[in-house]
Amino acid sequence: MRHFERIATQLKDSHALGQVVGQMQGGLTVPEESRLAARQKILALQDEVAKLPPVEIVPQHHFSKGLYAREIFIPKGTIVVGKIHKYESLNILSQGDITIFTEFGARRVRAPYTVVSPPLTKRVGYAHEDTVWTTVHATDETDLEKLEAELICPTFPDLLTDDEILALKGGD
């Protein structure tokens, strides 16, 4: 098993993906579509990307006391679908130009750029230029399989109870 594997492909492989990325760049926002509709669009895109020849995205893992950082290089023209992160995380774009689409909308960003992602976020990205993206999590864990179990939610939290969602968000 490749840890934190992403589904990725070169965009030039599919006209349909080009249309979806065009929609992403159009700036989908929550008021225009419900979060559920946006999640469905993300999952449909993931299914389409999975049918195409993959681009291997190999993460570099960095550890420091209480912190885990995962850095990836995304080649220009690549569309990448990440996993659902259970907890708030720090994201750093140190190189490149990328459009990021989540259930909260789409935004094109250029390095340098830093943002805190809310919990239970799944991202789709299209790299307009070669891009370096780093996600930082607060954890003392260093075992990659345990990290995946700790940090990644296999499906959108539609099936979680309100109490479980509140607990993931750090509520009482």
Q: Would you name each region that the model predicts?
A:
Residues T78, K86-Y87, G105, T121, ...:
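A generic "binding-loop/recognition-motif" signal
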Residues H85-F104:
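Glycine- and acidic-residue-biased ligand/ion/polar-headgroup-sensing regions
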Residues H128-D172:
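Double-stranded beta-helix
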Residues F73, T102-R123:
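Short acidic-glycine-tyrosine-enriched beta hairpin
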Residues M1-E71, I165-D172:
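A short, N-terminal "cap"/entry segment at the start of jelly-roll beta-barrel domains
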Residues L67-H85:
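Conserved short histidine dyad/triad with adjacent acidic residue
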Residues V80-G82, I100-F101, S117-P118, K122-H128, ...:
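Short beta-strand His + acidic residue motifs that chelate non-heme Fe in jelly-roll/DSBH
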Residues S94-Q95, A111, E129:
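A cytosolic small-molecule/anion-sensing beta-strand core signal
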